[in-house]
Amino acid sequence: MDGGHGAADGEGVTDHARAVIVGGGVIGASVAYHLARLGWSDVQLLERRSLTCGTTWHAAGLVGRLRGSRTASRLVQYSAELYARLPEETGQATGWRRSGSLVVARTPERLIQLRRSVALGRAVGIDAHVIGAADVSRHWPLCRTDDLVGAMVIPDDGRVIPADVTQALAAGARAGGVRIRENVAVTAARVRDGAVTGVHTTEGAIACDVVVNCAGMWARALAQANGVTVPLWPVEHFYAVTRPIAGVTPDLSVLRDLDGCVYVREEVGGLLFGGFEPAAKPWMVEPIPEDFAFSLLKEDVEQFEVLMRGALERIPALESAEIQLLLNGPESFTPDGNFVLGEAPGLHGYFVAAGFNSGGIAGAGGAGRALAEWIVNGAATMDLTAYDPRRFLPRHAEPGFLAARMREAPGLHYATAWPNRESETGRGLLRSPLHERLAARGACFGSKMGWERVDWLAPRGVEPRTAYAFGRQNWFAHAAAEHRAARERAALFDQTSFGKLLLEGPDAGALLGRLAANDVAVSVGRTVYTPFLNERGGYESDLTVSRVGAESWFLVTGSAQRLRDADWIRRHITGGIRVALTDVTEAWATLGLMGPRARDVLARVSRAALDHDAFPFGAVRDIDVAGVGVRAIRLSYVGELGWELYVPSPRAGEVWDALVAGGDVTPAGYYALDSLRIEKGYRAWGRELTPDDTPLEAGLGFTVKLDKPEFVGRAALLAQRVRGVRRRLLLFALDDPEAVAWGDETIYRDGRVVGTLTSAGHGHTLGRPVAMGYVSCPPGAPPETLVRERYDIDVAGVRIAAAASLRAWHDPAGARMRA
């Protein structure tokens, strides 16, 4: 069927294209340019009004290279390089100016954040350094400095004229054969059998294989027409421009005072200043008017006051300056502050590039190239999981949730980047059936994929609220007690947020054999831990596969991978494959009973045979627990004897109560789970395992069976095995027991940068900080030689010596969990 959007295929079609891009802002122009560069000339870009008319035209044009992650920084690095060369290539100016950036710190905590950013910059090749407060005036003579503790300088940052960048990209796209049509609106994609076949427009239907939704503020509504989730919402966004001010020169760098919520740059001899208020103002309009083009919103002096105050505190000369413009232009933001980039789940050929959180100019070049490569190659060529549309549930796009979250999300761009920071708005989308019980026990909850999850539990008399810090946070001792309970006695984790899928049918085994790198052709009652790989040999997911029937498999994956894994499987159900895939996540609660006494605790409330011979490691059994039918899998993510108990959600409370009734079980949260798994060297999706990492690099070659029939990624791994890996995951233990690392710290080997930490925590069993991270190595070098080198970890500007290992620090032989 055609998805309910008009005529059948071929009927009413007035044009054809290989790809149609919807939206003529800087993002759409970048995608068009890069598709043309990759040889796709049969492309149309459709703009409902005129190029740049949505939000691009009023953007401030800042291009700051150093972002919050390695991937984001690399994307913007490319943008800066592109904008610098486009004028020569296309003959169209971009306004690129290498102005540099100066980021000032009012507090010691902010200075720690800047030092962490400098370390990240070194790892990705961005020049950045910290200066003292006394040196700030040399970079910015008009800047007040008496309340500063330091600053960060990024010499290669820059600025552009957004409309000019868009026109340059459009010129390059046209030169490559792209057809750009203005005053043509797209109303929906044409769909047949789960794939794009064209688009409906105000000028008729166009047949195409690919549609790219770059519709900016309108992207959510356009996506909804085809059942696609794009959770973004427009927010009123402000900046002011002054008339010329004495002492303001064109060579001033862009000044950012994150503690004051503002940025400042030169503008025709005056200053342009704006920022991100801690309490933003969503533009509460639905739908967004179709005729909103080159338009602005009403001035709101009261909302702008916090930015005005921050600017005055930093630039006293503004007190006597004349404001000639106060601009209020909407910008679209997403719930987690990352843009939406990639192919939509469940609809082949429907791509999205939207929700750039006021960073569209900086991100457009890199994002446009990354998405174009995805479209042309059929898969992403780099790790884009932080931006993948599959990270959101449909409920994340509901107006009530978005309106609440958008009051908070924009301000987090300039808020202190605390480790483990949790959003406070739009919470409670999904709750475990054990939520109230855990809340009564003092649980402090975090959020993952919409689920409320226990981070840590506060003892009686302690407020269950995290006090953020770059050092040890207030939960450290409480999570340590939970950690020790799992190592010494028994701990009980609520892991209900795990994604749970049921795959059934005559061809289920063959399909899994094609997708899984491990051998999943096991007998009924066995569980296998396996990667799902892409064609590059990188991780698409890691999960457990339990055979629960002759034609039935129970798949358990991480909380964030629920939609991702289901979509990955469905994409491979082709050619009459006889299977049924069902998401049963919310039907089952998950209890993780872990620790050396776990068998005794479970035996007290179950009649099942639990000894090692009857219930070995890796087995799955349907047993009774307190009279409730439970699916038990003997696995451990903490490195101790344990079971994952899958309980029908309505009866989860009965099982929980029975397990804790004896008083010998300690409820525990995810902070303890994380320190336990790092101490044991267990890799985590999104940290050690990403689409850019292979099992051979991750030290998980034992989870891959290269001698089994063909599976996705096998050829890439065979080739890598021959040529040798160029990077390898190592486990680290820091020498300083008081050091606090959080991940993303830079790794030095013999004084040279060789990688960054992927995970870090405190090994309470070892009494030392522990971490993991990839380091570069010569191809074919024996891994054992890597651990004999000298390593240091840059923790907020201080290098701390660390021991390296290929094996787990705790129970490297794995005997305890197999007891």
Where is each model-derived feature located?
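Central beta-strand plus flanking loop segment that forms part of the substrate or channel wall
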Residues: A60-R65, S101-V103, M217, N226-P250, ...
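Glycine/proline-enriched, intrinsically flexible loops and inter-domain linkers
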Residues: M382, P389-A819
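Glycine-rich FAD pyrophosphate-binding loop
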Residues: A36-W57
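C-terminal catalytic lobe of FAD-dependent flavoproteins
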Residues: P162, D259, V268, E290, ...
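Dinucleotide-binding Rossmann-like beta1-alpha1 core, especially the glycine-rich loop
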Residues: G61-H139, D259-V264, V268-G270, D291, ...
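Beta1/beta-strand and adjacent pyrophosphate-binding region of the FAD-binding site
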Residues: G12-I27, Q44
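Flavin (FAD/FMN) cofactor-binding and adjacent substrate-gating region
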Residues: L82-R85, E89, R97, R106-E182, ...
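Flavin-dependent oxidoreductases
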Residues: S30, R70, A188-E299, V306-L318, ...
